[in-house]
From Swiss-Prot:
Residues 319-672 are annotated as: Uridylyl-removing. It comes from Neisseria gonorrhoeae (strain NCCP11945). The lineage of its organism: Bacteria, Pseudomonadati, Pseudomonadota, Betaproteobacteria, Neisseriales. GO terms for biological process: regulation of nitrogen utilization. It comes from the Bacteria. This is Bifunctional uridylyltransferase/uridylyl-removing enzyme. Keywords: Hydrolase, Magnesium, Multifunctional enzyme, Nucleotidyltransferase, Repeat, Transferase. CDD domains: ACT_ACR-UUR-like_2, ACT_UUR-like_1, HDc, NT_GlnE_GlnD_like. The gene is glnD. Belongs to the GlnD family. Has four distinct domains: an N-terminal nucleotidyltransferase (NT) domain responsible for UTase activity, a central HD domain that encodes UR activity, and two C-terminal ACT domains that seem to have a role in glutamine sensing. Residues 1-318 are annotated as: Uridylyltransferase. Modifies, by uridylylation and deuridylylation, the PII regulatory proteins (GlnB and homologs), in response to the nitrogen status of the cell that GlnD senses through the glutamine level. Under low glutamine levels, catalyzes the conversion of the PII proteins and UTP to PII-UMP and PPi, while under higher glutamine levels, GlnD hydrolyzes PII-UMP to PII and UMP (deuridylylation). Thus, controls uridylylation state and activity of the PII proteins, and plays an important role in the regulation of nitrogen assimilation and metabolism. InterPro entries: ACT-like_dom_sf (IPR045865), ACT_dom (IPR002912), HD/PDEase_dom (IPR003607), HD_domain (IPR006674), NT_sf (IPR043519), PII_UdlTrfase/GS_AdlTrfase (IPR013546), UTase/UR (IPR010043). GO terms for molecular function: [protein-PII] uridylyltransferase activity; phosphoric diester hydrolase activity. Residues 673-757, 785-852 form the ACT domain.
Length: 852
């Protein structure tokens, strides 16, 4: 590199470092962009002079660099423009120039060609056209730059350009769905991200308006409040993106788990707990994108309407205050929301009641939103406002859209201060993937879908139950309040009771409705915990659950709320196995509350009789049946539910020569049920678990049963790896059965091996602290309950079973609850040695070492 260019490169590095240092000290986005742009342009000036002295070409900044928004590691977008087609010599010259840019580590993205060629290249390329919309002259022949800009502007179909950008935005938002996009959002392309702000400005500039917020304010396109809020949201997002690049040392626009604490700390969020640091950063991020989405809902249709051809305007009178314009509702006088604040809820009430109205007319929305910022205690105390708000839930029609609309524009948080505390609050617990407010609204949506016949095919039984449930509005309210006390410290279910009861008292609920609402909020985790962690075949467990529930109404409401809560937490959590657990508990509790199955011996006898009836219908001799029941023992009927007993019996009675392996594909699921019947042996349960883990199966549930004659009957529910299609399941089943048969007949071993499956970034950088509790069971000497919470990983259950074996602890029952990347496992174990505190402590320590 010539000496003069080496000197220019050194100057650039110094200026770039100075720009970063000034930014880190002053924390001003605009100053960083200005100084970094100047540093790049100084270097480009030297390079241009070296390669194109006295040339007819010109150099233009386009895209983000043209906009004057260069991020630390982003591409430098440029265009080399010629008044005439490029000769071979000029093309070689441009290639050398681009190589020099790479040598200087500028990360160039360069378009080159004649004015006509470049115009033609973007005719059907919306991305290229957008880049040139922000073009600005740098060096060379200015006349060529002006000619290009003029031809581009003449060529551009403004209405088509705007529609294309809006379609592009819709596609971008659609790609930003799913847990990864929520937990590790792309700060540029996510809904409400930087690209949405750019889209607004592009739409404005394409129609001849200003391309920056201060000038749009001067042109009265934005109000002062809107310009201020949009500027604030933009600065927040730009700060995060700059810090992302500086910490990652690359053009990383995703808020990855490993980078979140670093970015948070660099932005001044001080906390020794990395998870809390990250949660605070993400809350700032979510609130910023929410502001952008709020303003986008107002400004995008307003800007679009200035140039787009719209269908014929159809206006209908609604009442003295409102008219309907096509599918929108408009206020006759937009100051009505300031003069008569009760109309803040009235217009929403009208929109909820009428299916032919889908939105507020933009100017009405702008005025309405401005008035909502005046919501205060006096507004809350107005009985008309309270009746309307409660009416949103009593009506149910369009409830999800109504609540999401009110949440988007901050009305829920202003009306209910408790709601404001959960907006954007993320939970790094390895199974929640949404901020608390979004999760709650997803749960409301799920409850509401159960009430609609059009969605009955999703969950037919639960839908039928919901559609016959009399107090649907109380269920909607329970969903709305179930997590409202999150983030306060302590038990959110208990703390939420006061919020629910206060709301009920203020919004004209009866005492009976208030009691049901408060009970559901307090106990919303009860059914999930019992079904997933406890042995619901144990009459004592069922009896304790029913004593908490007490009535069929509560049972139905809790069942419906639990289903909706799990489905709204993380799409990965809901599966056929979890559905069957809840349904089994629901039916068992229903029989118990009705006075049936109250006697445990009667229950066990009924289970045995059901199995005997099945075998008799299959023409199995009574002698053969008796042989099976004697081998399994009476305790078998206490530890297994009817469906398992029927399956075991049908498979064992004809081929009762252990060892035996059987499996079946569970209907409408991605899971197998597997049973193994064989003589007991050392570490047998652990070795079986290793076989499943080696095949990539997640163990969803396991029941380890030892007969009176020292045989094991272990039953597993295992989830098939997600990369397999349903048509592959029979082959996978055959392969698994073959390996298990080989193992139980002694032909292969299943020994300890390392874990090859990668642990997710979320588990590595936002882990949860493992916890273990060991509790003696009062009615059963030497029997203990062991509760374990930890990060999920392959071979975890096998490793824990090895620890039990090493400490002379016999595993009698395992209830595995896999919640995405988190496990909450419950074991029933037998060991006289655990009376000794030292041995119990040693067991805990050994388990913790496996969980770490």
């Amino acid at each position: 590199m010539p000496e003069n260019l080496s000197s220019a490169l050194e100057t650039f590095k110094q200026q770039r470092n100075a720009a970063e240092a000034h930014y880190l000290k002053a924390n001003r986005v605009s100053v960083f962009f200005r100084e970094y742009t100047a540093a790049v342009e100084t270097l480009l000036a030297a390079l241009w002079a070296e390669h194109f002295q006295n040339s007819a070409l010109c150099l233009m900044a386009v895209g983000g660099f043209g906009r004057g928004e260069p991020y630390p590691c982003s591409d430098v977008d440029l265009a080399v423009v010629s008044p005439a087609p490029l000769s071979d010599g000029i093309q070689e010259q441009i290639a050398r120039f681009i190589q020099t840019l790479w040598d200087c580590k500028l990360m160039p993205s360069v378009k080159s060609g004649s004015v006509d060629e470049l115009c033609e290249s973007v005719r059907d390329d919306i991305t290229g056209d957008t880049a040139f919309l922000e073009a600005r002259f740098l060096f060379g022949n200015r006349q060529t730059a002006d000619e290009l800009a003029e031809k581009m502007n003449v060529q551009r179909n403004v209405a088509a350009f705007i529609e294309a950008k809006l379609v592009e935005m819709e596609h971008r938002h659609a790609k930003s769905q799913g847990s990864g996009a929520v937990l590790e959002p792309n700060i540029k392309s996510c809904p409400g991200g930087l690209r949405d702000i750019h889209t607004l400005l592009w739409i404005a500039k394409a129609q001849g308006l200003a391309a920056n917020l201060p000038d749009l304010l001067k042109q009265r396109i934005l109000t002062r409040a809107e310009a201020g809020m949009l500027s604030h949201g933009y600065r927040r997002l730009a700060h995060i993106r700059i810090r992302l690049h500086l910490n990652a040392k690359r053009a990383e626009d995703r808020l990855l788990f490993d980078l979140q604490p670093q970015v948070a700390e660099s932005m001044g969020y001080q906390d020794e707990n990395r998870r809390r640091q990250s949660e605070e950063l993400m809350r700032v991020f979510y609130r910023a994108v929410k502001t952008v989405k709020q303003l986008g809902g107002i400004l995008t249709p307003m800007l679009r309407s200035r140039v787009s051809s719209t269908p014929m305007r159809v206006t209908l009178r609604i009442d003295d205050d409102y008219i309907q314009v096509n599918n929108q509702i408009a206020a006759r006088h937009t100051d009505i929301f300031f003069r008569r604040p009760e109309h803040i809820f009235k217009i929403v009430e009208i929109m909820q009641q009428r299916n032919d109205i889908t939105a507020l007319e933009p100017q009405t929305l702008r005025a309405w939103w401005g008035a909502t910022r005046k919501i205060n205690r006096s507004f809350y105390q107005n009985s008309e406002n309270r009746r309307r708000f409660a009416g949103f839930f009593r009506s149910g029609n369009g409830l999800t859209q109504t609540l999401r609309f009110l949440n988007l524009y901050g009305v829920l948080g202003r009306y209910l201060p408790a709601w404001e505390k959960i907006v954007g609050l993320l939970q790094h617990d390895l199974f929640h993937i949404y901020p608390v407010d979004d999760h709650i609204l997803a749960v409301v949506r799920n409850v509401r879908r159960l009430a609609l016949d059009m969605h009955s095919h999703e969950l037919p039984y639960a839908s039928a139950l919901m559609q016959s449930f009399e107090k649907q509005d109380i269920l909607y309210l329970a969903a709305f309040f179930h997590d409202i006390a999150k983030g306060r410290g302590g038990d959110h279910a208990v703390q939420g009771i006061a919020d629910a009861r206060q709301f009920a008292a203020d919004h004209f609920l009866t005492e009976e409705e208030s009691d049901l609402l408060a009970w559901l909020v307090e106990n919303h985790l009860l059914m999930s915990a019992v079904a997933q962690k406890e042995d619901i075949q144990d009459p004592g467990v069922l009896d304790a659950f029913c004593k908490r529930v007490q009535t069929h109404e509560r049972l139905s409401a809790l069942y419906l709320l639990t289903i909706s809560d799990i489905r709204g937490t993380n799409p990965k959590l809901w599966n056929a196995w979890r559905a069957s657990l809840l349904e089994s508990l629901f039916h068992a509790a229903g029989r118990c509350l009705a006075g049936n199955d109250g006697n445990p011996h009667a229950l066990f006898g009924r289970r045995r009789q059901e199995a005997a009836d099945l075998l008799t219908r299959a023409a199995v001799p009574e002698k053969q049946q008796k042989k099976l029941w004697n081998a399994l023992g009476s305790a078998y009927f206490a530890r297994h539910q009817s469906r398992e007993i029927l399956w075991h019996a049908a498979n064992l009675v004809h081929d009762f020569e252990p060892p035996i392996v059987r499996s079946r594909i569970l209907p409408q699921s991605d899971s197998f049920q597997v049973m193994v019947f064989m003589p007991n042996g050392p570490r047998l349960f652990a070795r079986l678990c290793r076989i499943f883990s080696r095949h990539g199966f997640d163990i969803l549930a396991a029941r380890a049963f030892i007969t009176e004659h020292d045989y094991i009957l272990d039953t597993f529910i295992v989830q098939i790896p997600s990369q397999h299609a349903p048509e592959d399941y029979p082959d996978i089943q055959s392969a698994l059965e073959a390996e298990l048969n080989s193992f139980i007949h002694g032909h292969t071993v299943a020994e300890t091996q390392s874990c090859n499956r990668r642990i997710s970034r979320r588990s590595r950088y936002m882990p949860i602290a493992p916890s273990i509790t060991i509790t003696p069971e009062e009615d059963y000497p030497d029997r203990y309950s062991v509760e374990i919470t930890a990060v999920n990983r392959p071979f975890l259950l096998a490793d824990m079973a090895e620890v039990f074996f090493a400490h002379n602890v016999s595993l009698r029952y395992a209830k595995i609850s896999t919640l995405d990347e988190r496990v909450e496992d419950s074991f029933t174990v037998f060991s006289p040695d655990l009376k000794n505190p030292k041995i119990q402590s040693s067991l805990k320590q050994a388990l913790l070492e496996q969980l770490a």
